[in-house]
């Protein structure tokens, strides 16, 4: 495997982004013409019967089998339905703490009116976003609180950026298919370690899902792919980008 240095000073959090949106005319993510393809219309996938695991995720430094990685983290990943009030979209997200703090892509919520979002857990229960801690259009992530009053399973964040050639796994809801599990490798690390190019497939609806290492830790937020390239070009945002902003 090729090691790539990723030393960079984290950005200073912007205090203006630490407050929740408080009125119906506000937006969880501000619309802009940034060249990203529009998200697909909201889609209904097959029913999901797995229940949320209401225990704290324990530290485990050993290499896990693919089945163990899925079993450890699947209930921490959820589907997101959003709407501008006129058009619906679908993406993914995942918990990063037991008290309901979660992360997804900024573009999943872009243009979404407050109250027009549904967080659908793997057990089928639906919740709303109660607070936005930070959002970054540039780095395409949003950290928020899901209005859930019990402990939830969550994904442990990895301490470091993975290396080129390392095995990775994804969990998300491509085309609305809840908790789809895929695997691949780190193909390249780009843009000063902000972008992880991966060979695991990322389709519409996978945006905001979790990218995992062989220990079952989050190393990225799955973000997109190049359609019809024939070269399996997919990418994720480095999870290290969110660390300065986690409450």
Task: Please place each PLM-identified region on the residue numbering.
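Conserved active-site neighborhood of the chymotrypsin/trypsin-like protease fold
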Residues: 83-90, 97-172, 176-180, 193-197
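Short beta->alpha transition motifs characteristic of CBS
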Residues: 97, 105-110, 172, 182, ...
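Short, compositionally biased
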Residues: 181-193, 234-237
């Amino acid at each position: 495997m090729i090691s790539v240095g990723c030393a960079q000073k984290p950005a200073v959090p912007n205090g203006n982004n630490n407050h929740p949106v408080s009125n119906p005319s506000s937006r969880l993510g501000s619309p802009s013409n940034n060249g990203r393809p529009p998200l697909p219309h909201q889609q209904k996938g097959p029913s999901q019967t797995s229940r949320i695991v209401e225990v704290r995720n324990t530290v485990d430094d050993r290499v896990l089998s693919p089945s163990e990685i899925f079993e450890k983290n699947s209930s921490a990943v959820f589907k997101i339905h959003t709407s501008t009030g006129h058009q619906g979209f679908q993406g993914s997200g995942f918990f990063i703490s037991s008290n309901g703090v979660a992360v997804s892509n900024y573009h999943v919520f872009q243009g979404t009116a407050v109250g027009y979002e549904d967080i659908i857990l793997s057990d089928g229960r639906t919740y709303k976003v109660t607070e936005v801690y930070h959002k970054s259009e540039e780095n395409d992530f949003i950290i928020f609180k899901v209005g859930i009053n019990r402990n939830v399973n969550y994904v442990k964040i990895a301490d470091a950026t993975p290396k080129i050639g390392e095995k990775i796994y994804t969990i998300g809801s491509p085309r609305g298919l809840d908790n789809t599990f895929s695997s691949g490798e780190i193909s390249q690390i780009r843009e000063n370690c902000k972008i992880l190019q991966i060979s695991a497939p990322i389709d519409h609806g996978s945006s905001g899902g979790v990218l995992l290492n062989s220990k079952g830790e989050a190393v990225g937020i799955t973000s997109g792919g190049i359609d019809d390239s024939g070269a399996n070009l997919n990418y994720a945002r480095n999870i290290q980008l969110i660390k300065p902003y986690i409450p």
